[in-house]
Amino acid sequence: MILVWLFVAAAILFGLLGLSLYMLRPETEKTRSFAAFDHTMIAHRGLFDNHSEAPENSLAAFRKAVDQGFGIELDVQLTKDGKLVVFHDFDLKRMCGIHKKLTELTYAELEQYSLKGSTEKIPLFSAVLDLIAGRTPLVVEIKVGYDYKATTEAAAEML
C-alpha cells in the first residue's frame, strides 16, 4: 500500500512540475506580437524640439521619427466634440499658451492654436496614423480627462 501512495505522490509531483514548466514557457504568440519593438528606439512624443518647427506630438516630430527609424510614443485624448487628437497635457497652457482644457474645446476651435509658436497644430490621431502608415512601431498612451471608455474605444477603432 505504501508503494502505491509513493507512486501517486511521485505522479502528482511530476505532474505539478510539468504544469509549472508549461506555464513558465515563453509565449511565442506574444513574443511575435512584440517583435517590432526589439532593438527599436522609441521617440517619446515624436522626435521633437519644442524650440523648432517640430514640437512634441506634432506631425513634423512624427515625420522626423519615422524618417530616422524610430518607433513612436504618443498621447491621445478626446476633444469636446469627440475627435481623437494627439496631445499630452490636459490643458493648453504649456504648448499653446492659453488657459483652457483640451476637453472644453472642439477640434475646430483647437485648430486656431499652434504648438509652441510653430506652424504645427494639434493633430488628429487619424492624421498621425496616415502619416506613419504602419512603417514603425507605435505606443499609444490613452489620456483620460473625463471619459475613459469613449477614448479607449475611439483609439481601438482606429487601430
Where are these regions (language model features)?
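Phosphate-group recognition and catalysis centered on beta-loop-alpha active-site segments
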Residues: 2-159
